[in-house]
């Protein structure tokens, strides 16, 4: 995993896990875009393996499926699930509580109550894995 904040800032929230082979990057500031595009990841987010995050904002309790691509200026609000292999194109603003899938990603349906609960569970699970590793237990 590489999080490269060479020309803008990167923020990773509490309880968030960023899995193997993920690339996080930012966009530089320009006259047209004085803030550029930082990478902001909220609390209790699971970012699956081999995801590309580029200058986007992800809210709290989200799951970004393996192999997904999230482009500049995308706004993902709290409690969103992005299906594996999806691409969210530049500048899209998604809706909370929804499952998005495809290339380009489109809203498929509302998340179930169980799926919404799973978003937090997933992040907490990886926190337990980390704690078990550090304590020498499995």
Residue map of PLM features:
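Glycine-rich hexapeptide-repeat left-handed beta-helix
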Residues: 6, 12-14, 19-27, 31-41, ...
